[in-house]
Amino acid sequence: MALQWIVIVSLLISSAIGGGRDNMGTEFILGFMENKISGTANNIELFVTTTSNTPADITVTTPLFDPSFSETTTVSRGNIKKLELTYNIRGSGTAVENKGVRIVSTQEITVYGVNKERYSTDGFVAFPVDAIGLEYVLATWKSEAVFMIIGTEDGTTVQITLSSSNPTATSITYNGATYSNGQTLSVSLNKYQTFHAFSSSGDFTGTKLVSNKVITVMTGNRKVAVKDSMTRSSSDHLVEQVPPIDTLGKDFFTISTPDRNIGDYFRIIATEDSTEISLAGSVYTTINQYEYTELNVVTGDYKSITSNKPVMVTMFGKTISTQSGDGPNGGDPQFSILPAVPQFPSDYTFSTIQTPTGDFNNYLVVVIKDSAKNDLKLDEQSPSGVTWTPVSGSSHNLVVATFEVNPGSHSVYNTKPSATFLGMAFGNAQTNSYSYAAGTRLAPINGPCTPSSTVAGDIVDNDCDGWIDEEESNGIDDDGDGSIDEDLANLPRINGNWAAWGQWSACSLTCNSGTGSRSRSRTCTDPAPANNGIDCVGSGAETGSCTVNTPCPIDGQWGSWSAWNCSRTCGNGLNTRNRECDNPAPQHNGADCSGNSTESGACWAGTCYPSVLGNLDKNCTSSSFGCKAGNIDCVDLEKSCDGAVDCTDGSDEDPQVAGCTPACSGAGVNDGKHTLFVSLSAISVIFRNWRLLL
């Protein structure tokens, strides 16, 4: 099956409680078998997804392989992450190698492996370490058969017994010895070691594996054509991970590859002697342990397959034929191991992944009880426009329908968790096909059973009747076994829904200064997701713009300083200047200006001269005398030259300043005798200074 599209199928089932097993887990140890390379080799691909509402942190390593490989990634619900490993990690020939691949995760995940080469591709759903076992039986087609065993613990010993009844059984040459039909070889493995076996012309169907410690087992064909008289020669890689024998069952049915009319092969392999096989309610044949019977079933022939002892049922899609109308969209062989009816879950999700060369025509085949088909949801919608066909001979009143689905992710589940169903994914394109079970429970329904108390959705056969989680918590005997609510399915799936938005927060603005922001939140609580329900889609928070009408405070700012102003017109004084808080003035409760509104300092305004004699600056009035210095500025003019010192510096009696006549006794007492002289002297000084001004 060369890949153009590969469907990656994720099982969405209830969390395993109390030891339940399914194809979801937190640790996987896998291997990849030999493929036929044509041209440039392609890397191995791993796809991982989760049904947890908490993102899963995933690490992939090749612990023993050289060169070693390690990569980490995170995947959230509803998404798929792809990781690539070198094609050299594939097994080759018949040998023990160090090619185990380990995957660990912080949450339960579903893992898919894709072994892809040009025109030779297949994929498989991986089983976690807690769901694998000790005993297996193999199924392959008739040539280029391969199988691989991967050790999960040190000191593992596996006894491999080749089929003694397979008409096309093969031989194995290992460590210089050749083993053929009915013979047993022993292989020793440590953790992460692999044993790979290849036969170019034989068939390993019916080969038995028994191990002392749990092992992972892969089976299929390197590249093979699944032919009948009408088919062509196109071939493909086939691979499946093998379920342990203790998970096999007794209740199956046939289905058909969509978009084909050439029919399909089914092989039924017994795990115990005297196994009676019935088709559509009638005995068909009896086979012994590790024998198989093969059915060539025409397209559209849906019928039950039942047995009195556990069997493994495999489906081989045929190579495209020359028959008119067969494979209008192409097709190649494909290989699936069908789950037994008790292992069906009630909730799946699957997604298609495109390769560069084009699209598959993608299909989902559903088999469900007729009474439950109307409770089915595909992408949250009730299916319509499909034809439901009964399964002949089914005691469960099963019906089959095929849904064509677009590329992308899809979810299909039943609103009643006790109503389980089969989901098989198919795809056809030119020289390409794929098919495998969308998911499976892996409960040990074929092993010893001890009755236990039920926990809803625990994936455990609590009442040891070979069925799992078949009752609803309703006080009714749903399965008709005389007991009530003894093996409970999970409660109905509840998808999360957003509650109303909370109040908006305060605007980031406190005043009208532009556009601000605000936020609000909501919770996924109306209802909250429960019972494997999907979390709310979208964000629990949002922001929006906002404005405020309140004017913003305006803080005051100082205006310019005024000119300096001396407090005295002459002599020593106090120099001051001031400024106003008006550039701008504070508004709307804005802060006042900080600092002082005035500044001061000492100043000298110049010599205080007489206003009449020598005082051209007119610092004193015309009736005053300006002292030259000292603390007194001006005195009455009549006190100058009166023989009494009035200015502290004596300048009012100084002939050079006041113009007093030196000849006058008593320093020029102003007694009337000197008045005219003084006046004339003063006039003389005035005129002298006036001439200087001119």
Outline where the language-model segments fall:
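Sec-dependent N-terminal signal peptides of Gram-negative exported proteins
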Residues: 8-9, 13, 642, 680-686
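Extracellular calcium-associated, cysteine-rich motifs in secreted modular proteins
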Residues: 449-494, 631-639, 643-659
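Thrombospondin type-1
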Residues: 492-632, 637, 649-664
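Cleavable C-terminal sorting propeptides in eukaryotic secreted/cell-surface proteins
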Residues: 669-694
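Sec-dependent signal peptide recognition
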Residues: 2-9, 674-679
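Intrinsically disordered, low-complexity linker/terminal regions across diverse proteins
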Residues: 2-3, 14-454, 464, 480
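N-terminal signal peptide
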Residues: 10-24, 687-694
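Short cysteine/histidine-rich zinc-coordinating motifs and their immediately flanking basic loops
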Residues: 524, 581-582, 640, 645-646, ...
